[in-house]
Amino acid sequence: MNPEYDYLFKLLLIGDSGVGKSCLLLRFSDDSYVESYISTIGVDFKIRTVEQDGKTIKLQIWDTAGQERFRTITSSYYRGAHGIIIVYDVTDEESFNNVKQWLSEIDRYASDNVNKLLVGNKSDLTENRAIPYETAKAFADEIGIPFMETSAKDATNVEQAFMAMSASIKERMASQPAGNNARPPTVQIRGQPVAQKNGCCST
């Protein structure tokens, strides 16, 4: 067990290109926002350590490229994820319609019990809204996953989204048999014995 934290959770941000995944990550990890962004190439990640219920939780958050040409690269990152956040743009109907495709990617590549959260980003752009809150909420309820709208620009619900995901993973871990949690991280992320060497360079 690492004395610096009680749990390490690997989170994955997925969704169409341009929906604001990188902006959400930047807002949560660094509390900053940039108006112009450069599309993520392959994958990027940031780490933030949080306190929840008296436990120290290290969140390793992976930001994936939304473009089709990177799909093969990013699909390999699903396997070790404890939680996956599916992001769409509330002003972009196509990005919402494609959520089903992203969910099928999760079914194909991620572990069966992975925690999921649907996030509608750019909620600050009220005049350009294409997807009503009620529509997305009904869809999320139908498939049985939590839903939240966020704005990386004005920081609305960004902290809450990541903390809610962390709490749901922690709750799931607590209900599992002892030893089957996120400590140490090499077990969860790589599926290899702790003593295994050179297994964490790509995580």
From Swiss-Prot:
It comes from the Eukaryota. Its main location: Golgi. Keywords: ER-Golgi transport, Golgi apparatus, GTP-binding, Lipoprotein, Membrane, Nucleotide-binding, Prenylation, Protein transport, Transport. Residues 176-203 are annotated as: Disordered. One of its GO terms (molecular function) is GTPase activity. The keyword Hydrolase does not apply. One of its GO terms (biological process) is endoplasmic reticulum to Golgi vesicle-mediated transport. NCBIfam families: small_GTP (TIGR00231). This is Ras-related protein RABD2a. The lineage of its organism: Eukaryota, Viridiplantae, Streptophyta, Embryophyta, Tracheophyta.
